[in-house]
Amino acid sequence: MKKVLVNQVGFLCNAPKKAVLNFQANEFSVVDGNGKKAFDGKVEHFGTDEISGEDTYVADFSALTEEGKYKIVADGQESVLFSISNDAYDKLMKDICKCFYYLRCGDALSKEFAGEYYHKPCHMTKATVYGEDVEPVDVTGGWHDAGDYGRYSTAGAVAVAHLLYGVRFFKGLLDVHYDIPKVAGDKGNLPEILAEVKVELDFLMKMQRENGSVWHKVTTFNHAPFLMPEDDREELFLFSVSSLATADIAAVFALAYTVYKEYDAEYADKLMQKSLLAYKWLLDNPDELLFFNPDGSNTGQYDEAEDISNRFWAACALYEATSDGKYYSDAQELKNRLEEFDKNAQKKGYQGNVFTCLGWAEVAGLGSLSLLLKREENALCSLARNSFVAEADRLVKVSKENGFGLCMGENDFIWGSNMELLKYMMVLSTAIRIDNKPEYKLALEAGLDYILGCNSMDISYVTGNGEKAFKNPHLRPTAVDDIEEPWPGLVSGGPNSGLHDERAQTLRGKGLPPMKCYIDHIDCYSLNEITIYWNSPLVFALSGILE
């Protein structure tokens, strides 16, 4: 089928702008809502690329800067209607930020703030410490992690980190207003994004034991069936502590200290004390303590290959927050260990430079972000700068290998491929601040175009944003709330050539290219689930685009 593929939300006035055609055409026009021509241009033939399987043609209309609603027309085919405006992404930004409110655990979502997506309080019982004969623990609050109702320390810490680094790097994020209720402990001066992040920080504090270690997760023993959160009344379990969770919490509390001290010194000091307590536990327990589910449990495992990157992040975050040289020394030693691991690893869960990895499974790049914020002339800060520039250069090279200008290779289309892209967009938006190369911006904007519909599925991977936005996330509350549309702003996991779930496996044997390994179906947890740490990198990257 002939398609004109375009960012379905739109473009900023002075941003690069393109559409991709999967059919031959020589010329194209941009017309307004009344059919009046606003721009004519020549189509450039790129050719076939491995990730889309399409013979692609590119229509560049970057020269059109006048605000308005437009369509692309070529060879009798039309795109969806999109906007050109400096406000083009205002709704998108509000939606992706407010999703964290909709994912709150414990709190009732009121009609005043959640509208038709309201629900009663959930998961208010104390949690049993699995395998220990101790009193149950109150760990209420925080955010539901994903399509399930679990709450996971490492995942939550990384999502919070994306948001707080977004605040540190791009001040505009503090000015995003999206109507959420006042949170406990807010003295009335917290910007909305920091009020929402406080919800998760308060929960993560409860996940820390008195000795500083941190429970890896709190979930039911197995995933709940598809029901509303308030109807999930199975016993909650706190599963064992891990050095992964403890290091991530040490890091994110130190980062949070640097932000919240401007608004609430007492709260910030509490975060720092808990960060130091976690870090002391790490020093007292130098051997890695990884995490694996007990037999019979199927909730998220969030296992990692090593804890070196987590400890590195913690040391870097504490050094940035305190300027204490002992953390620099620790980070230097951990850097050496991580380089050795990276050199010898038989199987890596990441592409590119380990010091720019920004996801829950490999967090060294988060440590690098703290070093970039330090802005010092020393070996580690130079490593961070050089790593981000080198990785951005790699991504630009990859982006030139397909007609979409997308900085993803065939191996990036894994479970949560959209997060892979969004992490790369974080790298590019950070690298722009180090070395403002035009090609970084092109690759960054092309990534956003892909997420918002300029892809061979012709679908926007953000609910409620774009004419053909996906509508069937693997998400319990939206599956059973009897409301036709899911709440807006959710980011889909996206195409996954592994096709890991039963519904996705119906695509096997069809010889599909990676970009087309996708179904918008509620059963497709390996293609169409959502999670807090798929929204958070988009918040960071979009903040960079809007800066």
Curated annotation (Swiss-Prot):
Q: What is the lineage of its organism?
A: Bacteria, Bacillati, Bacillota, Clostridia, Lachnospirales
Active-site residue list: 148, 474, 520, 529
Q: Which GO terms describe its molecular function?
A: cellulase activity
Organism encoding this protein? Butyrivibrio fibrisolvens
Coarse class of the primary localization is: secreted
Q: Could you name the domain of life of the organism this protein comes from? A: Bacteria
Which reaction(s) does the protein catalyse, per the Swiss-Prot or TrEMBL entry?
A: Endohydrolysis of (1->4)-beta-D-glucosidic linkages in cellulose, lichenin and cereal beta-D-glucans
Reported regulation of activity: Is not inhibited by methylcellulose.
Q: What does this gene product do?
A: Glycoside hydrolase that rapidly hydrolyzes short-chain cellodextrins to yield either cellobiose or cellobiose and glucose as end products; cellobiose is not hydrolyzed further. Also shows limited activity against endoglucanase specific substrates (carboxymethylcellulose (CMC), lichenan, laminarin and xylan).
The protein in question is named: Cellodextrinase
Where is this protein localized, as stated in its record? Answer: Secreted
Q: Which PROSITE patterns match?
A: GH9_1, GH9_2, GH9_3
Keyword entries, A-Z = Carbohydrate metabolism, Cellulose degradation, Glycosidase, Hydrolase, Polysaccharide degradation, Secreted
A biological process (GO) annotation for this entry?
Answer: cellulose catabolic process
